[in-house]
Amino acid sequence: AYQTDFQTEGFEKFELVYLGKGTADEYRNVDVKGKLVLVEINQREEWWINYPVYQAHLKGAAALIAVQSRGYAQIDDTALNAQDIAGPPEAPAFSMSRADFLKIQKLMKAKQEGGRTLPEITVEFDAETQVKKDQYTYNIIGKIPGSCSDSMILLSAHYDSYFEGFQDDNAAVAMIIGIARALIRGGYRPYHTIVVCALAAEEWGISDTKYDWSTGAYRQVFEARPDWPGHVIADFNFELPAHAHSTRDAVRCTYEYADFIQKFVDTVLMPEGIYPDGMTTLYPIETWSDDFS
């Protein structure tokens, strides 16, 4: 389930109808009131899940079930996906693996061959998902005092996660703690105070808004520690470090730091066997990680 409200209180029968990508054209002359709507979406190359979810909600559907087509589905057909919903809790949404979708698709085709005009079957659905508002999460910080106490360098990563969260982003939390431990064990005394930040609510933190991610980092800077702006000279934020993703590594930064970072990147000796195309500098920063705050 996504961050939405839906309770069946046990198994409940629904009609499940497949509507392609869930666009307005695919709803034409189709009554989905009280039904489960099954769609295929590609959140990387087309649109986010909130658009087909809200479309289904406005049409009176009981809920929408999303299957990732390409994009986030490329790891494995059995993989489930979950991201932030960027929408209201009363528009329920669920995730289904491609493997399960292909089984259901076969059943729907058999029904169509039997005379049904729409790809539709009857299913039993059991769901319990509830959004509890005004709950607490905690950002965890530690400091290595520098000789200049008025300036800070942040090492940040988020510890909230979907599923096991090893890649996104617990491996990064271990990295920043390991960096801090190495500095302390080595007896290094920094000039700038080093602040290690394990941040909450990066994946999702506010209901019923398009901007529901990176909440923990935003509130750390603008609410919990409003004294930080003007004193942080850099934030080194770490995301998805456990898997290479590509043949080339990259440091993403603001425009102002691009030349400085590139000079550093040019001096890095890449370990043998990883990133055969080396490392580069990308800019500007993206909204999809805590450093944007």
Show the residue positions of the predicted features.
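Noncatalytic luminal/extracellular "stalk/propeptide" segments of secretory-pathway proteins
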Residues: A1-L36
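Structural recognition of the beta-strand scaffold that forms the well-ordered cores
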Residues: L16-Y18, L36-E40, A63-V67, P92-M96, ...
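Metal-dependent peptidase/peptidase-like ectodomains
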Residues: A91-A93, F101-L102, S149-D150, L199-S293
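Loop-rich non-cytosolic ectodomains and luminal regions
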Residues: V32, V37, V53-I121, E164-A174, ...
